[in-house]
Regions:
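Carbohydrate-active catalytic/glycan-binding domains of CAZyme proteins
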Residues: 1-355, 359-411
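Beta-rich interaction/scaffold domains
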Residues: 409-485
Length: 485
């Protein structure tokens, strides 16, 4: 972190800044850096060996027994910090905030996980710090069916990130792991409400970070169960920067889903040209949710977002689901608005059902139902939930995506072109995944695919390579071989 110096009486005024480094895995360390090297410890200072308390869960501090933490405010609960790794420092008003990957969950009634960001605040880049609590839990905590407890609705592994003010709105950036796979990290962003006062932390000043909802009371979203457990971190949604809701009249892949009753069904994709991450092997009772669709539209450009038209009477809005059946039996997908249950906790409304006939082709197919009665008068933003229903116990379908259409706006599922490569007129296998990065190949992107063709023994003629694509707009360039060696 760079602390810029503007006070003439500061000893570093002539240099203009102070630099700090923060590091550590399951142990927090920090140091002031030499401004001349920007990597070594500043002369006259030392590495802080135990900067913030690290832990797995409350009551399990990883630090040595009887260690002191001079960079934590006296009286703070050392077990509330739970540092894991990945510090990021921001200045907010007259205070400093450190964001880090930490263990959370028991503080709001869930199991402990480092799939969360936490924060602390202080008067300097080196504290001393007071714990602010959880910033975001990528496991997507929400109420269970009857509101008696909180539950997770996404898989967990770990997360890293920070916060930033953009166009007057604060956001938290983090990542979540499809099906809990730590090497598949889906980038996420959510709006937050940041509040601070002018008092120094040493005199009782605070920084508070809560989930932001432009349509909620006081613009604050929260999830609190009937036992009093409350998750105050950012809400995990499908929106990204579109905090007034997604434009309903577009296609959204299964990768946008943010509520999964079974976190194992979310897959990932190596294809950088395909904004697609399928949900597979959906079974009876599985719930898939998207939060939120901006049925009320956005009447003018705001916060860097372009205005869009929502639903309205006369649109004859239809709901479109793109799925591939995996059974020869019939099954249903129930479509719910606001919640997957019609009870006091969720207040959901079933707006239709998609019936997939027996013996349907096991390929991605578009199914459409009229939902205009339920959505063409809505304002603000609302969630959509899919609930699978069948007498079968096995896999029912794979979900590709969904979206709404109207009598004026059609929906088209984007399909990435398929490339066919032939050698001497014989098709060869094109791999589904790109070349992986290794220490020897130096490849850092995911845009190179390698297909191999082994010449038959005794081949003397130079082979001819041809290629084509299902989309004529794909440009094909071939450099033919000049020899067989």
């Amino acid at each position: 972190y760079i602390e810029y110096i503007t006070a003439p009486n500061d000893p570093d005024y002539e240099i203009g800044f102070r630099a700090y480094g923060y590091w550590g895995f399951q142990r927090s360390l920090a140091a002031q850096l030499d401004q001349n090297t920007m990597y070594s410890v500043r002369p006259g200072t030392e590495v802080i060996p135990y900067f913030m308390p690290a832990g797995v869960r409350r009551g399990n501090n990883r630090g040595p027994k009887n260690i002191s933490y001079p960079h934590i405010f006296p009286g703070e609960d050392l077990e509330a910090f739970n540092f894991f790794e990945a510090s990021s420092i921001r200045k907010i008003g007259n205070k400093y905030v450190t964001i880090y990957s930490g263990h959370s969950g028991p503080d709001y009634g869930l199991g402990s996980s480092n799939s969360t960001l936490r924060y602390a605040y202080g008067d300097s880049p080196l504290g001393p710090w007071k714990s602010g609590g959880v910033l975001v839990d990528s496991r997507a905590p929400v109420l269970n069916q009857d509101g008696s407890r909180l539950q997770t609705t996404n898989a967990g592994h770990n997360t890293h990130g920070s916060i930033e003010l953009i166009n007057g709105q604060w956001y938290v950036f983090y990542h979540r792991p499809p099906r809990g796979f730590g090497n598949a990290r889906q980038s996420m962003v959510a709006p937050i409400h940041v509040e601070w006062d002018k008092k120094p932390v040493s005199e009782g000043g605070k920084v508070s970070i809560r989930a932001y909802d432009p349509y909620a009371k006081d613009n604050i979203w929260t999830a609190k169960d009937s036992q009093g457990n409350e998750y105050k971190g950012a809400e995990v949604t499908s929106e990204g920067f579109h905090i007034f809701g997604l434009d309903p009249y577009q296609y959204y892949s299964a990768g946008f889903a943010c509520y999964l009753s079974d976190g194992r069904i979310q897959q990932d994709s190596w294809d950088i040209w395909d904004n697609h991450a399928p949900i597979t092997n959906v079974k009876n009772g599985n719930i898939i949710g998207y939060k939120y669709f901006g049925f009320g539209g956005l009447n003018k450009d705001k916060l860097g977002l372009k205005a869009f038209e929502g639903t309205k009477k006369g649109n004859k809005t239809a709901f479109n689901l793109f799925l591939a059946p995996k059974t020869s039996k019939t099954f249903k997908v129930n479509v719910w608005l606001d919640g997957p249950w019609n009870n006091e906790t969720w207040k959901g409304t079933k707006i239709g059902e998609i019936v997939v006939p027996a013996n349907s082709a096991q390929e991605t197919t578009q199914f459409t139902i009229d939902v205009s009665k339920f959505v063409d008068h809505l304002d603000k933003k609302h969630a959509i939930y899919l609930v699978a229903e069948s007498q079968e116990t096995g896999d029912l379908f794979d979900l590709a995506g969904l979206g709404f259409s109207s009598n004026k706006k059609k929906i088209v599922r984007p399909v990435v072109p398929k490339v066919n490569i032939e050698v001497n007129g014989k098709a060869i296998e094109v791999p589904e995944t790109p070349v992986r990065s290794t220490e020897s190949n130096g490849i850092t992107g995911y845009d190179i695919y390698e297909a191999v063709y082994k010449l038959p023994a005794g081949t003397t003629g130079i082979p001819t390579v041809s290629a084509s694509a299902t989309d004529k707009s794909v440009k094909v360039e071939i450099i033919q071989a000049t020899s067989v060696s």
